[in-house]
Amino acid sequence: MQKMITILGPTASGKTSLAAALAARIDAEIISADSRQVYRGMTIGTGKDLDDYRQGDRVIPYHLIDICEPGTKYNLFQYQQDFHLIYNNIVARGVRPILCGGTGLYIESVLKGYALSPVPQNQALRDELADKSLAELTEMLEDLKHRNHSVMHNRTDVDTAQRAIRAIEIETYNLEHPTDNRTLPPIDSVIIGVDINREERRRKITQRLKQRLEEGMVDEIRQLLDRGIAPENLIYYGLEYKFVTEYVIGKTSYEEMFRLLEIAIHQFAKRQMTWFRGMERRGFTIHWIDALDPMDSKVAQIMDIAHIQP
């Protein structure tokens, strides 16, 4: 069986185009590890960049993108189950999988094989938390994580009160229903990190935000609202969907939306890197390569690290 290659990195680091270039070179298929790219119709705001999967005259097979409806709430448990179905199918065909994304919790959960279970809604707990601020909810979540010895629910993933309440709900359930934390098989993988210096990352984030707005991100979100998706359900997804929705429904001006969203994405990228460095402290070996190296050089470096013959 061919060992999986994992490519991780912060937003705007070019990890998807790198994964696609590598896949074209070694005849691999890509499994996405992005908590928002699972939603159909949320293309510009989540940065799917589907053109990246076109390499020359072929399209690299990709998985776990556009698999559920916007307005629904896809979760880590579902991702784990879906990942294993796809992963097992790929390796059974003798093909090498490449796991690629920036959602560190998704990546870590499948590599480590964390035991998860579907967590039911706890309406009494939700009612109790409804009036608390995001700061208060975050403090409660950190306390629960400490008591659970949990690495789940990094601040990257709880940037709205609704998401924080769901995270508290899950951690509370897990505290009351402990499980064996290794019931799923861990996945052996070579892990590649795409490192991009802070100044270049900030420049690319701002450039990409402007580009997405020019490409029609506001209209994309208007169309989702016109389809009957409640604003709070889009705000739940955070970042672009939070700030642009607030602009579309008249809560902020365009200029304020852009300013706040730009800051939020920069903060998000920083938190992603914090998560990846935390993975190293938790025992993962990540081979870092420079995002600014030429594509051919990056592909060659990965092949060398993974001991893949040219």
Question: What are the language-model segments listed below?
Answer:
Residues M1-P310:
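Phosphate/pyrophosphate-binding catalytic cores of soluble transferases and nucleic-acid-acting enzymes
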